[in-house]
């Protein structure tokens, strides 16, 4: 009889092979154990390390615990409480699900598992080591929760133990694992010790609000990161991106401040990292790494988490959509951040409190493909806002000394006029004798008009504001390609209630919901004339102050075109005269040219 060349591996050997994928180093053990504690509902986790984890890794939690009858199963390969069917795997939200971590860890160490559930009057302890798959169960003393001790890691695989680094290096890897997990779980306290000394202690925060989350971010990434970062809140359908993106000034050679998460799971995903790097491409030097903390939440059916042994990567079913969504969200946050950067000359901007609001901007989303990547200038502290109000400039321009007959004429740039027999400025035949005739641009800040025998200067900025006010009155609405999400604090929410009716009447379509104690707005559509504006900045300015006239507020705070060619200025005047000739008259500043025309 021919002997079989293919045979089934013994369970002990199979576990050790699996351990080669799951247990790379002590930090891998810590990651698996912490994730199990989180899945068990723990809100306090203590991790004790000795000699970099090679001698001892002890984790204690106050989770739901493991019942006596399940202790042996917990150490058996492919035994789990997380899933039961293939459909469960496709909808998985827990951090663990394969049921092989404890079996793999126990196959290369001496493992003790002590646990108690709330329904048990006493705790029970399970012990196993190495290739011996026998599990010893005995009574123990323990509060509700679980303690796992992993001693003498790789004691039975000398080749693996030989590749461990120094205690300091291995502990640094453990420290980084705890940091990454703690960032995603601010409502859970973590204590990390090494050789009996407390190294890290992250206290839990009260809730998941942005203000509370910032406490955990500051504890892990430092206050300097928070000072240089902008909170991002970006949502479209089932996709939700939130977190913090730093200013380009915080870019660094190493990626030690780059954190990304998918459905609460620590990730080092290529698609996410590429999208973020592309968003920063024009803002930071080549080779530098941006600093960011980003959380991506989406329907679990839209990704496959079972593609990496350590679950560091996922496979998105619509990778291009995810990439474009993240790219645009980060780009808009950066654009809003640069727009809000104060300058020494900026004196007329509205002060805003540094609070828990979003930093996304839908100017691109309003009318462009979300996969398009529109380049924008490298970071600069300068803005396009004038240092003086337009009215001051125009007043200085036309002001002449009453005691002097103005020996110097105003500087005027105009299209050449037809030469006449007399030196006086004459007008061409105007079919609308009571309409204004545009003669020239005045220093790119105003239009010189002639109406009958009178001359006027009209500020371009005021004209643009009037045009926006008239457009708002038309109440034409345009849907946004990707809705804009805003998170409001209590004061901002009260202002939103105050302005809600006026905003909806002017063409906004806004949905409101309450989430984790915060008011969240989803901007679905906006007035057509505001579609190119920084909506995030505009609305938050509105919710941070009081105004009686929304149209006037938007006109004064929108970024409007103030540089026109002469034909463009002519069309602007013609449009406004047809709609609001009386309001236009209020903007005209009379200019007396009689001294030059006689």
From Swiss-Prot:
Cysteine disulfide partners in this protein: none
DNA damage as UniProt keyword: yes
Origin superkingdom: Bacteria
Keywords: DNA damage, DNA repair
SUPFAM superfamilies according to UniProt: ATPase domain of HSP90 chaperone/DNA topoisomerase II/histidine kinase, DNA mismatch repair protein MutL, Ribosomal protein S5 domain 2-like
InterPro entries named in the record: DNA_mismatch_repair_CS, DNA_mismatch_repair_MutL, DNA_mismatch_S5_2-like, HATPase_C_sf, MutL/Mlh/PMS, MutL/Mlh/Pms-like, MutL_C, MutL_C_dimsub
Pfam name, any one: MutL_C
Gene Ontology cellular component terms for the protein in this record: mismatch repair complex
Free-text function comment from the UniProt entry: This protein is involved in the repair of mismatches in DNA. It is required for dam-dependent methyl-directed DNA mismatch repair. May act as a 'molecular matchmaker', a protein that promotes the formation of a stable complex between two or more DNA-binding proteins in an ATP-dependent manner without itself being part of a final effector complex.
Family: Belongs to the DNA mismatch repair MutL/HexB family.
Name of the protein: DNA mismatch repair protein MutL
Lineage: Bacteria, Pseudomonadati, Pseudomonadota, Gammaproteobacteria, Pasteurellales
Gene: mutL
